[in-house]
Design a protein with these regions (language model features):
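Alpha-helical transmembrane segments of integral membrane proteins
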Residues: 19-29, 290-310, 344-351, 355
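Hydrophobic, regular-secondary-structure patches
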Residues: 20, 24, 28-109, 129-135, ...
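A short beta-strand structural signal in non-transmembrane regions
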Residues: 55, 146, 201-219, 227-263
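Hydrophobic secondary-structure segments that place a key small or acidic residue at a functional site
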Residues: 91-94, 104-114, 121-227
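Peri-transmembrane interface segments
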Residues: 249-252, 257-305, 315-319, 334, ...
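Transmembrane alpha-helical interface segments in multi-pass membrane proteins
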Residues: 300, 313, 317, 321-367
Length: 380
């Protein structure tokens, strides 16, 4: 029976090549559409996945990683004092305006973190290092952003808001599909970028129970003053966005989450997986782009199945007389079906292998040149 299936496939090579091209197209369509959807979903929480934090602490209004209220830096000290916390680190997120050397502007997402920290890591660093971010107005970005930012390479300078900016490092695979261009820098530099063009003042009060509460206010600076902002250390009133918590070895995370929620006012406490899931669900379920990409993946699968089914049906129909002859010679229905199934398996394998190679190559190219992840998995 195996020889009959092979003979049916290879007796007309031009027809076979056309059929396999159709199957390869259908398989590629499904793989790319589903891969884009999964890659989009993965990229939205990639920075969370790259971190080694056990727990994330954010303002209770937090919707997802980038959409949240700020907290004062004093929450960092309060978190470090909670029993079961081995280490706590802060990160800040703010928006900004990029002005390239030739005067072009673009939106930015400025992410500040502790270069000496151990939990927040931006991914693979391909040029420069985290220590370089300690220098005034130094930043890193994904290497796929160089063209859009109009930068030539390390040492290139531009302007963020009204502050100078110097490229000190490059990362790879860190740019989310749905985010503005991401700039990574130290907390101090991020503060300078976010407040450039502004003057600040701190007001503190002693509240009930003799607790000290401080707030920082900002006012627009005189535009005639073109001097760069001063890099200053953060104060307890300066805003941060998230706290990353590493638990003591053996510490139950659910118990520690409850302690942190009780010790820190107006916060939400999530594990790393919960934070990543919350962010992905927002983009997948609550935005138009998630719906459109999901719909595209579903339609791609349906179209792919229809194309493959039509090709297989056409192949069987072309050999209906041979199957009739086998039936007349006493072949059972099971034997006939085995020939058809064998033929379908050969067509699937011979169409899928080149399709997979094509999709892997395309995924590598888009990741390297555009920073767009097409996630190829065994299921796709």
């Amino acid at each position: 029976m195996v020889s009959i299936a092979r003979k049916n496939l290879f007796e007309d090579i031009p027809r076979f090549v056309v059929a396999q091209a159709g199957i390869m197209f259908a398989a590629s369509l499904v793989t790319i559409q589903v891969g884009i959807f999964h890659g989009f979903t993965r990229s939205t929480a990639q920075l969370i996945d790259n971190s080694s934090a056990d727990i994330w602490v954010s303002a209770e209004e937090m919707v997802y990683f980038e959409l949240t209220q700020s907290m004062p830096l004093e929450r960092l000290t309060e978190a470090q004092a909670v029993d079961g916390v081995q280490r706590a680190e802060a990160i800040s997120l703010s928006g900004g305006r990029w002005r390239s050397p030739d005067g072009k502007i673009a939106p930015l997402r400025i992410i500040g973190f502790d270069p000496d920290g151990t939990m927040f890591r931006v991914g693979e660093v391909v040029a420069g290092g985290f220590n370089d971010l300690k220098e005034p107005f130094a930043f890193m970005t994904d290497r796929t952003n160089l063209d859009s930012l109009r930068l030539d390479g390390l040492g290139s300078t531009a302007e963020v808001n009204s502050a100078p900016a110097r490229l000190a490092g490059l990362t790879q695979g860190t740019q989310s599909i749905v985010s503005s261009t991401m700039l990574f820098t130290s907390l101090e530099n991020a503060k300078a970028y976010a407040t450039s063009g502004l003057t600040s003042s701190v007001f503190c009060d002693v509240g009930a129970g003799d607790g000290l509460s401080c707030t920082t206010t900002y006012e627009r600076r005189d535009e005639s003053d073109e001097s760069p902002p001063e890099i200053t250390a953060l104060t307890i009133a300066d805003p941060i966005t998230h706290l990353l918590i590493r638990a003591e070895p053996g510490q139950d995370l659910e118990v520690l989450k409850e302690r942190l929620a009780n010790a820190l006012p107006d916060v939400i406490v999530l594990t790393q997986d919960e934070m990543a899931t919350r962010t992905r669900n927002y983009w997948r379920l609550r935005t138009g782009i998630g719906f459109i990409l999901g719909l595209g993946a579903a339609v791609g699968m349906i179209v792919g199945v229809v194309i493959v089914g039509q090709i297989l049906y056409s192949s069987v129909s072309d050999h209906i007389r041979e199957y009739g002859t086998l039936k007349a010679m006493g072949a059972s229905d099971r034997m006939i079906y085995s020939v058809i199934i064998e033929q379908a398996l050969w067509m699937a394998v011979l169409g899928y292998i080149p399709s997979l190679l094509l999709c892997v190559g395309l995924g590598a190219w888009t990741a390297a040149t555009q920073g767009i992840m097409i996630l190829i998995t065994p299921l796709t």
